[in-house]
């Protein structure tokens, strides 16, 4: 993945709270800011001064700053698409066009003298991005970002999301999407506060699980927290989670032997290329520990989806191989269930593709 991001809404809170949040997020590994101008209703001078101070602080902490705008904002602030110097004065690194222009204007904007990134709204299936590409933009300054959706049931479906994202990915453009905090009394740019996910299926999931889902999909570069303010505990999880692969949270059997525990938590895992229908197979451990006696110690009659299996020596040359159950199945009596993936993360199994890497962390 690319960057972890946060969102800030200076007109909705105090400047101190915004700056404190930026500091906390920076310490947790975040390096991108989505800052909304759509709901800012002050004068040009007041907006410039307020955002400049905040953005300067953020840049001192190593953040990239993208401002969310639309044609109305351009009009209200007296900005022309061929002169973006106002945003540079605000210490921004780019602008996100919530609503676009004609395609030609966006192309011209990517050649702006200030070298600002021009971010396009990804959450639609039209030929909008194709039109922009027809006008030969500066690809180095063209990126994409999905919307978030405050109203329950209005978030994107997964299939639609994939189609929208693929439309941008085919051009090799950097992409972004939003996850939502589950903290109480959060807010965004609008009065409705029922969470702010890109995907509807994420609305009630723990924020770290939403993140892991995007990592599993392998379609999104930058992942941004949309609402303010996540809890310290939510931010803390991002210090520990792997960003380069899905890291399943697991509970291990109390009597798991040391070698089996080491296989789960320390060995390098990836799904075999000849991926079966019922299991995710990680075979390296059976080679590394060839000759070790894997005794039967927990062979339940039924293996459930989400169970982690390490084959016993009664399975011959399969002994020591790690598997994840993708479906419920009857145990042959030779398979040890050594642990189980957290219930809220079991659905992530369905998104692990052949050769995809994954890991485990004990709860």
Short names for language-model regions:
Residues 2-19, 68-79, 193-205:
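Active-site mouth loops of central-metabolism enzymes
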Residues 2-10, 33-35, 63-71, 93-97, ...:
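Hydrophobic faces of well-ordered beta-strands that scaffold small-molecule active sites
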Residues 13-26, 76-86, 129-130, 206-213:
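Short, acidic/polar
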Residues 17-39, 89-94:
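Catalytic domains of carbohydrate-active enzymes, especially glycoside hydrolases
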Residues 31-54:
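Glycine-rich, proline-tolerant flexible connector loops at the mouths of alpha/beta enzymes
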Residues 48-93, 104-105:
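N-terminal active-site wall of soluble small-molecule enzyme domains
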Residues 121-254, 263:
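Catalytic alpha/beta core domains of metabolic enzymes, predominantly
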Residues 253-363:
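C-terminal functional modules
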């Amino acid at each position: 993945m690319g960057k972890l991001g946060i969102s800030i809404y200076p007109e909705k809170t105090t400047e101190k709270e915004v700056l404190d949040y930026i500091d906390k997020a920076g310490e947790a590994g975040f390096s991108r800011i989505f800052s909304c101008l759509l709901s800012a209703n002050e004068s040009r001078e007041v907006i410039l001064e307020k955002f400049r101070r905040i953005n300067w602080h953020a840049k001192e902490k190593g953040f990239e700053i993208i401002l969310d705008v639309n044609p109305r904002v351009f009009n209200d602030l007296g900005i022309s698409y061929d002169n973006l110097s106002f945003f540079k004065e605000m210490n921004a690194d780019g602008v996100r066009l919530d609503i676009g222009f004609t395609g030609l204007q966006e192309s011209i904007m990517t050649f702006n003298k200030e070298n600002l990134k021009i971010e396009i709204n990804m959450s639609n299936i039209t030929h909008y991005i194709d039109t922009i590409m027809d006008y030969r933009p500066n690809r180095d300054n063209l990126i994409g970002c999905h919307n978030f959706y405050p109203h329950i049931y209005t978030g994107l479906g997964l299939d639609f999301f994939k189609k929208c994202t693929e439309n941008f990915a085919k051009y090799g453009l950097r992409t972004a999407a939003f996850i939502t905090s589950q903290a109480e009394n959060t807010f965004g740019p609008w009065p409705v506060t029922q969470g702010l996910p890109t995907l509807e299926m994420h609305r009630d999931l723990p924020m770290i699980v939403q993140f892991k889902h995007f990592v599993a999909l392998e379609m999104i570069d930058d992942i941004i927290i949309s609402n303010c303010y996540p809890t310290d505990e939510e931010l803390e999880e991002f210090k520990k989670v792997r960003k380069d692969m899905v890291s399943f949270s697991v509970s291990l059997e109390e009597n798991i032997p040391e070698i089996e525990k080491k296989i789960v938590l320390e060995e390098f895992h990836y799904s075999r290329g000849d991926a079966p229908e019922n299991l995710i197979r990680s075979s390296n451990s059976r080679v590394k520990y060839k000759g070790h006696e894997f005794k039967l110690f927990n062979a339940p009659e039924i293996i459930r989806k989400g169970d982690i299996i390490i084959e016993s020596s009664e399975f011959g040359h399969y002994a020591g191989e790690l598997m994840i159950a993708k479906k419920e199945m009857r145990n042959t009596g030779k398979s040890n269930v050594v642990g189980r993936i957290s219930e809220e993360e079991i659905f992530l199994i369905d998104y692990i593709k052949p050769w995809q890497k994954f890991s485990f962390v004990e709860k």
